[in-house]
């Protein structure tokens, strides 16, 4: 029997071409269209496409120096002739030394400026009046010279902080040794009045001495109250005398005249003679 007639009931097998095995058809490819060629060979990994709601990762920056901004500034100041540079000179040193900052955007310049103003290890030096130019100088604090380990700008020991100056002491109190204010000065004693009752009572007769010549109206020794004295001197007002019912005190001149003429008044003194005058009210002795 013919073999072609015996397998006529089975579907025909696909014919194999001598060119080699055919590539499998990719899912979603149109029939009759050849698949696109893969670029880079089979060793290349396909790029991960972020799904919806996911952020694409930023690529790593290649060629960036391993130094911090503080280390870059300190490196620029260390290579300066006078150990000080302006901000523009620091930018120029960094771009000339590292090509990464020369080709990258200028955002790093803001970081350099912020590190200069926020770190205590950098000190601003004003420009001299006779030195032309723009901008102030920046230098490294002498106390921060050992900020990096063994002069390596890759490792920093600790954050430098400038020591603050002590505050001035408060002023001393006005009386440091006296817990209480000093006592007020004693008030001066009021001046003694010319005539007081107690001074008249304690009046003692003075020893006889040279007596000035008396006026003619007071020459009579037997007159206790000369009329000329009463007429010459007006009576003085005394509230105490009025309250006690006493006559007004005599002026100074008649009293001195009475004290001088002790013989006319009797054996008693001038004070006793003054108390025994007939003008006193009865019962005055109990007030003395």
Curated annotation (Swiss-Prot):
Tissue: Expressed in the embryonic lens.
Keyword Transmembrane: no
CC terms in the record's Gene Ontology section: nucleus; transcription regulator complex
Keywords, comma-separated and alphabetical: Disease variant, DNA-binding, Nucleus, Transcription, Transcription regulation
Region ranges (Disordered): 1-62, 163-189
Mutant lacking the gene: phenotype: Knockout mice are viable and fertile but show eye abnormalities; in some cases the eyes never open. Eyes are much smaller, the anterior chamber is not formed, and the pupil is markedly smaller. There are no abnormalities in brain development. Mice show reduced smooth muscle cell (SMC) density and impaired SMC differentiation that is limited to the ascending aorta.
Pro residues composition-biased segments: 166-189
Location of the DNA-binding region in this protein: 64-158
SMART domains to which the protein is assigned, alphabetical: FH (SM00339)
GO terms, molecular function: DNA-binding transcription factor activity; sequence-specific DNA binding
Outcome (variant: residue 93 to L): In dyl; negative regulation of lens epithelial cell proliferation; positive regulation of lens fiber cell differentiation; positive regulation of epithelial cell apoptotic process; loss of sequence-specific DNA binding
Cellular localization per UniProt: Nucleus
InterPro entries, alphabetized: Fork_head_dom (IPR001766), FOX_domain-containing (IPR050211), TF_fork_head_CS_1 (IPR018122), TF_fork_head_CS_2 (IPR030456), WH-like_DNA-bd_sf (IPR036388), WH_DNA-bd_sf (IPR036390)
Induction: Head ectoderm expression is induced by RAX and lens expression is induced by PAX6.
Pfam family, one: Forkhead
Major subcellular location class: nucleus
Disulphide-bonded residues: none
Function: Transcription factor that controls lens epithelial cell growth through regulation of proliferation, apoptosis and cell cycle. During lens development, controls the ratio of the lens fiber cells to the cells of the anterior lens epithelium by regulating the rate of proliferation and differentiation. Controls lens vesicle closure and subsequent separation of the lens vesicle from ectoderm. Is required for morphogenesis and differentiation of the anterior segment of the eye. Controls the expression of DNAJB1 in a pathway that is crucial for the development of the anterior segment of the eye.
Disease involvement: Defects in Foxe3 are the cause of the dysgenetic lens (dyl) phenotype. In mouse mutant dyl the lens vesicle fails to separate from the ectoderm, causing a fusion between the lens and the cornea. Lack of a proliferating anterior lens epithelium leads to absence of secondary lens fibers and a dysplastic, cataractous lens.
Identification of the protein by name: Forkhead box protein E3
Protein's organism: Mus musculus (Mouse)
Gene field: Foxe3
């Amino acid at each position: 029997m013919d073999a072609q007639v015996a397998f006529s009931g089975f579907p025909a097998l696909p014919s194999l071409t001598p060119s080699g095995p055919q590539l499998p058809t990719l899912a979603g490819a149109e029939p009759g269209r050849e698949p696109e060629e893969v670029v880079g060979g089979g060793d290349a990994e396909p790029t991960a496409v972020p799904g919806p709601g996911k952020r694409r990762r930023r690529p790593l920056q290649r060629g960036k120096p391993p130094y911090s901004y503080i280390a870059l500034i300190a490196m620029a100041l260390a290579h300066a002739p006078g150990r000080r540079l302006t901000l523009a000179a620091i930018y120029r040193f960094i771009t000339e030394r590292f090509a990464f900052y020369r080709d990258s955007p200028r955002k790093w310049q803001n970081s350099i400026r912020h590190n200069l103003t926020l770190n205590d290890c950098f000190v601003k030096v004003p420009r001299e009046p006779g030195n032309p130019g723009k901008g102030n100088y920046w230098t490294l604090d002498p106390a921060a010279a050992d900020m990096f380990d063994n002069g390596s700008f890759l490792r920093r020991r600790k954050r430098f902080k400038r020591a603050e100056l002590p505050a001035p002491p408060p002023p001393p109190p006005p009386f440091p040794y006296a817990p209480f204010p000093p006592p007020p000065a004693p008030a001066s004693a009021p001046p003694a009045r010319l005539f007081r009752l107690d001074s008249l009572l304690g009046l003692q007769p003075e020893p006889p001495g040279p007596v000035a010549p008396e006026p003619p109206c007071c020459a009579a020794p037997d007159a206790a109250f000369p009329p000329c004295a009463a007429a010459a001197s007006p009576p003085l007002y005394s509230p105490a005398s009025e309250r006690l019912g006493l006559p007004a005190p005599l002026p100074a001149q008649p009293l001195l005249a009475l004290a001088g003429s002790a013989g006319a008044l009797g054996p008693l003194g001038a004070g006793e003679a003054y108390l025994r005058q007939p003008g006193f009210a009865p019962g005055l002795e109990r007030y003395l």
